[in-house]
């Protein structure tokens, strides 16, 4: 299975996020899942790429020209797919992937989560987004989604489009279930 991972490219974040991300990368490789990601060489993006490669897995990087020109491309990609911008990257990652996992991240990660989820809600695809809620990182987003649903701003149950995993065991069940 091809699992797209959305995550932070920031290096200055909670060190536990790196440890948990390494465990996920190891699990992906050992279970034959390919990594599809933004192809950047910093932060959790770099961490997940290195972990997958260290355990014999395959990496597919969807790399915008701005990242490449800045010398920030992950150096050990098995496949590099170049694109013009972040919108193209999301479209290409959607086409390349079977499901999506969101690790801790910022504005870019939120954009990716909600772009994929919105496309699912109106029927463009039926691929799930899983929030990997390590250390409760996504709790405020989960509360926001619940609040929006309570106010009838979301049609149906948002959990039909976005799942939540609090640990690797839950994540594995959702990915393989």
Which residues does each predicted region cover?
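Active-site/ligand-binding-proximal alpha/beta "capping" segment
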Residues: 88-123, 130
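Short, structured loop/turn "capping" segments at alpha-beta junctions
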Residues: 59, 124-127
């Amino acid at each position: 299975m091809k699992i797209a991972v959305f995550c932070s490219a920031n290096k200055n974040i909670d060190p536990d996020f790196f440890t948990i991300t390494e465990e996920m990368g190891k699990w992906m490789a050992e279970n034959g899942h390919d990594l599809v990601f933004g192809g950047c060489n910093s932060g959790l993006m770099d961490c997940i790429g290195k972990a997958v490669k260290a355990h014999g897995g395959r990496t597919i990087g969807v790399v915008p020209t701005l990242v490449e020109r800045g010398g920030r491309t992950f150096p050990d990609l098995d496949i590099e797919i170049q694109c013009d911008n972040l919108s193209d990257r999301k479209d290409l990652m959607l086409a390349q992937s079977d499901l999506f996992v969101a690790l801790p991240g910022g504005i870019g990660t939120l954009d990716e989560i909600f772009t994929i989820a919105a496309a699912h809600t109106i029927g463009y695809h039926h691929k799930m987004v899983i929030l990997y809620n390590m250390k409760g990182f996504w709790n405020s987003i989960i509360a926001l989604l619940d609040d929006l649903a309570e106010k009838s701003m979301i049609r149906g149950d948002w959990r039909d489009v976005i799942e939540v995993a609090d640990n690797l065991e839950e994540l594995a069940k959702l990915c393989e279930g």
